[in-house]
Amino acid sequence: VRSRRQRQMCIRDSLEADKLDSGIYIMVDTLKYLKKGGRVTAAGAAIGTVLGIKPVLQIHGEKLDAFAKTRGVKQAKKKMIAAVRKELEERFQDGDFGKHAYLQSAYTKDEEAALKWKEELMAEFPGMEFQQDPLSLSVACHIGAGALAVAWTHKIDD
């Protein structure tokens, strides 16, 4: 029988080993907070806002990078779905994504948009276990309201 501490270490070790075997994509709805944080210049934010630019950020492991710049929410959603599909197809050639991975979505503030996003993802990835939650405050304070995200996580073997 394992002690509580041993079980916690086992879980932690599994999560650490699999941290690079997942992907997160976040669509930022407004450039205001990226500008405040110094990630976008004032001129870049002004031009991007006029053009309706929605940046898509990518997190793999511990690294946050710009993934794409899209025009509008619809294009950003398509870009995120395509990126997740590509990653899943590359890692799980049998096509049974639900057997190998979980799908999650997240959002900041706009629950109505989040529910629509969830429905779109469930239609795009049938058979996958799915969860939706608000983005953590540590992320939300840097990207602002209206953000949508999608993530996939490798299932951990027991």
Question: Language model features by range: what are they?
Answer:
Residues 6-8, 41, 72, 110:
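Helix N-cap and loop-to-helix transition residues
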Residues 15-77, 81:
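Active-site rim beta-loop-alpha module in soluble metabolic enzymes
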Residues 3, 34, 44, 48, ...:
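Short glycine- and Lys/Arg-enriched binding-loop motifs that mark or flank ligand-binding interfaces
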Residues 12-17, 102:
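Beta-strand segments within the central parallel beta-sheet cores of soluble alpha/beta enzyme folds
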Residues 59-158:
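Gly/His-enriched, cation/cofactor- and phosphate-binding structural elements
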Residues 1-3, 7-11:
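Single conserved hydrophobic/aromatic residue that forms the stacking wall/gate
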